[in-house]
């Protein structure tokens, strides 16, 4: 007996769970493929509403069908979604009928929903849908055009594509397409010269003139179409509420005689089942549509078909807002109002003070940034950039905050190097790109002019062997320049310093010399305004990961007007690389860079520093060192043993002679950088005969020594030299290394 009772309880529980799902009758399939069925629909015997065969579906190969139309969705909200194929007509090249088909359907007790449109594709065509097969009771649209326009993509406006709403209520329909009679000039929708007509749910078709729609000729391809369904033959007045399940509501159908059911508010499920509408627990559901709206001063209590908010002690429910409020104690209410009003007033005052302070701080910061901008030469930069001719560089203005973040607050661990014109930091921008940030020395106003000059010069340069300027920041106490990051240090580091590389072959060094010479030739001759670098040295030549040379540090550079060959300036440069003629006269020209390049070329050949006080007195300067070695025919003694071999001796000798020619005492005797670049390039790619002289007069050698000896002698006892030349003070940075 107990076993029988347990069995009955189990059956009751299973039946109740099945009804809670609100989908189908017990023991009936709930799905066909991916489509979920709901009563009154079904496809197994006894699973659909027996009084109406329209609810009898068929499931074939996991696909659900209704009267030959594939069903993709069923809803107990009285709608069925099916796939309806397109009708079409195709014409041959003479405009004659080639093939085509159209479709008609008897929907039984189901009717076409008003949420569909009739659509036509193709020029000079029209489509219609009829409820009885005759055109006089049809709804359609016309598509007229001479040729398809891609400008109409995305919308059916009557040009190549048209659409028209379809009224609800039809249960027997035919869909057809036609072409205007005697029109053979039609530009078709695709290569097949076909026109199409089809029903489609609103918003489910997007027109594109470039698409090929020939796939619509496949009977198994269709567009979603919405059908309305109801229980036919009786109205709610005739059947009463008993025909809908418990907690269900009956509504008359809008299309013909019939009715539909829906669950009352607070219930959900299938209203066509006796116990299909189940209570919604608003207190626990995660569905935001049904979830309760009780305030934090109350707790939610679920009721059948609704819920109730229970207020805490000393609170009562406001039925208008469904929120809890303090109970009507005048003293309590007054005290609460006073505290609340005082708190709000205090917060408003604090907020106002905070806003005023924030605004004042922003104003002060803006004024300070503007002050720094002017102090750092921002106005001068804008004026010079506007008057310097066309710019090849898009100079980006960085913010002070951005520079702090990029350098981690100018952390010492980010310092890449320090020189006469400031400190260089490694920076990381928000996009994770690595840059080099050059910061002028604090309190050195002379650096401002050099920074502005560097921006001005680099704005005129667009060359692969020049370090690229990305932008600047002038709203800080000292100006900042932002460059591309070159990862492998300087040429000085590789030849003499911490990054000394014994594998720096002759091919590497010759290529670097060609790149540096080509860059200087570009600056002198090909830039929009001729540029003299004025501080060429191995410490200002950067190398990337491929050992490609990049000329850097244009702080001392000068733009030379087109109508001038020389420019009188304060003498500036690095001892060991400084042109003796420029040092003595104060007149700067492109031959000054030629001299400095000759010194760099000698360093590449010998691996020796430009100035070395460990060498003999007469050879402290590398120019004297080379001159004496050339004169005494012992050049092989000073060439770096890492580069010379029996296969490249002639090339190295030619390169050495080029270096000596570049360092002649007077500029007139030196070649131009174009000639130097051409000769070095010839050494690199061919074995052509060298055009430089093979012998050097003894008098010229003496001139080399005399000019260099003066610089060396003056530089042995002082870190800086004061020289009164044409009433200008010359300041020379003595940097044997950097």
From Swiss-Prot:
Pfam families: EGF_CA, GUB_WAK_bind, PK_Tyr_Ser-Thr. Residues 23-335 are extracellular. Its EC number is 2.7.11.-. Residues 232-278, 279-325 form the EGF-like domain. ATP binds at residues 416-424, 438. It is found in: Membrane. GO terms for cellular component: membrane. It is a single-pass type I membrane protein. Residues 410-693 form the Protein kinase domain. Glycans are attached at residues 34, 56, 109, 115, 132, 182, 208, 293, 318. PROSITE patterns: ASX_HYDROXYL, EGF_3, EGF_CA, PROTEIN_KINASE_DOM, PROTEIN_KINASE_ST. Keywords: ATP-binding, Calcium, Disulfide bond, EGF-like domain, Glycoprotein, Kinase, Membrane, Nucleotide-binding, Phosphoprotein, Repeat, Serine/threonine-protein kinase, Signal, Transferase, Transmembrane, Transmembrane helix. Its main location: membrane. Disulfide bonds join 236-250, 244-261, 263-277, 283-300, 294-309, 311-324. Gene3D superfamilies: Laminin, Phosphorylase Kinase, domain 1, Transferase(Phosphotransferase) domain 1. The modification Phosphotyrosine is found at residues 483, 582. Strictly expressed in siliques. Residues 1-22 form the signal peptide. GO terms for molecular function: ATP binding; calcium ion binding; polysaccharide binding; protein serine kinase activity; protein serine/threonine kinase activity. The active site is at 535 (proton acceptor). The chain crosses the membrane at residues 336-356. Residues 357-738 are cytoplasmic. Belongs to the protein kinase superfamily. Ser/Thr protein kinase family. Serine/threonine-protein kinase that may function as a signaling receptor of extracellular matrix component. Binding to pectin may have significance in the control of cell expansion, morphogenesis and development. This is Wall-associated receptor kinase 4. It comes from Arabidopsis thaliana (Mouse-ear cress).
């Amino acid at each position: 007996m107990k076993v029988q009772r347990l069995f009955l309880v189990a059956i009751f529980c299973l039946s109740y769970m099945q009804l809670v799902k609100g989908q189908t009758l017990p023991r009936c399939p709930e799905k066909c493929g991916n489509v979920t069925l709901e009563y009154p629909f079904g496809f197994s015997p006894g699973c659909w509403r027996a009084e109406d065969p329209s609810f009898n579906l068929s499931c074939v190969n996991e696909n659900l069908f209704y009267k030959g139309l594939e069903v993709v969705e069923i809803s107990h909200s009285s709608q069925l979604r099916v796939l309806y194929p397109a009708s079409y007509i195709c014409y041959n090249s003479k405009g004659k009928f080639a093939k085509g088909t159209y479709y008609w359907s008897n929907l039984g007790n189901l009717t076409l929903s008003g949420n569909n449109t009739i659509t036509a594709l193709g020029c000079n065509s029209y489509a219609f849908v009829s409820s009885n097969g005759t055109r006089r009771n049809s709804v359609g649209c016309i598509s007229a055009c001479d040729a398809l326009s891609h400008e109409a993509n995305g919308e059916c406006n009557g040009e190549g594509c048209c659409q028209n709403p379809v009224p609800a209520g039809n249960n027997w329909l035919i869909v057809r397409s036609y072409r205007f009679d005697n029109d053979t000039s039609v530009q078709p929708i695709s290569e097949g010269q076909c026109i199409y007509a089809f029903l489609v749910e609103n918003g489910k078709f997007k027109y594109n003139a470039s698409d090929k729609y020939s796939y619509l000729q496949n009977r198994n391809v269709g567009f979603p179409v919405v059908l309305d369904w109801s229980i036919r033959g009786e109205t709610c007045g005739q059947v009463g509420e008993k025909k809908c399940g418990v907690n269900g509501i009956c509504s008359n159908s809008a299309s013909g005689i019939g009715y539909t059911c829906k669950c009352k508010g607070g219930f959900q499920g299938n209203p066509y089942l006796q116990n299909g509408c189940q209570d919604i627990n608003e207190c626990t559901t995660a569905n935001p549509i049904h979830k309760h709206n009780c305030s934090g001063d109350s707790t939610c209590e679920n009721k059948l078909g609704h819920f109730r908010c229970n207020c805490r002690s000393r609170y009562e429910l406001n039925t208008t807002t469904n929120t809890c409020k303090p109970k009507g104690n005048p003293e309590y209410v007054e005290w609460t109002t006073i505290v609340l009003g005082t708190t709000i007033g205090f917060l408003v005052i604090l907020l106002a003070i905070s806003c005023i302070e924030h605004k004042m701080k922003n104003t002060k910061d803006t004024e300070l940034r503007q002050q720094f901008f002017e102090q750092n030469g921002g106005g001068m930069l804008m004026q010079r950039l506007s008057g310097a001719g066309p710019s090849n560089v898009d100079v980006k203005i960085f913010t002070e905050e951005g520079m702090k973040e990029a350098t981690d607050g100018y952390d010492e661990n980010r310092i890449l190097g320090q020189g006469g014109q400031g400190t260089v930091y490694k920076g990381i921008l928000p996009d994770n790109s690595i840059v080099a940030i050059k910061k002028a020395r604090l309190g050195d106003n002379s650096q401002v002019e050099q920074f502005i000059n560097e921006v001005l010069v680099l704005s005129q340069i667009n060359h692969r062997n020049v370090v690229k300027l990305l932008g600047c920041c002038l709203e800080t106490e000292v100006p900042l320049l932002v460059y591309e990051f070159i990862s492998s240090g300087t040429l000085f580091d590789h030849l003499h310093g911490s990054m000394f590389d014994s594998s720096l072959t002759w091919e590497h060094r010759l290529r670097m010399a060609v790149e540096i010479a080509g860059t200087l030739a570009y600056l002198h001759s090909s830039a929009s305004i001729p540029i003299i670098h004025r501080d060429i040295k191995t410490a200002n030549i950067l190398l990337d990961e491929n050992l490609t040379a990049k000329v850097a540090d244009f702080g001392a550079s000068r733009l030379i007007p087109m109508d001038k060959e020389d420019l009188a300036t304060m003498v500036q440069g690095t001892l060991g690389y400084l042109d003796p003629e420029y040092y003595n006269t104060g007149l700067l020209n492109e031959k000054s860079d030629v001299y400095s390049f000759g010194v760099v070329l000698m360093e590449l050949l010998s691996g020796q520093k430009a100035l070395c006080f460990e060498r003999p007195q007469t050879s402290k300067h590398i120019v004297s060192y080379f001159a004496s070695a050339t004169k005494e025919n012992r050049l092989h003694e000073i060439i770096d043993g890492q580069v010379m071999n029996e296969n490249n001796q002639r090339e190295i000798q030619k390169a050495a002679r080029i270096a000596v020619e570049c360092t002649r005492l007077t500029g007139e005797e030196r070649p131009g950088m174009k000639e130097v670049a051409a000769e070095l390039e010839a050494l690199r790619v061919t074995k052509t005969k060298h055009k430089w002289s093979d012998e050097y007069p003894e008098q010229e050698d003496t001139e080399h020594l005399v000019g260099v000896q003066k610089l060396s002698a003056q530089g042995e006892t002082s870190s800086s030299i004061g020289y009164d030349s044409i009433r200008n003070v010359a300041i020379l940075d003595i940097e044997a290394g950097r």
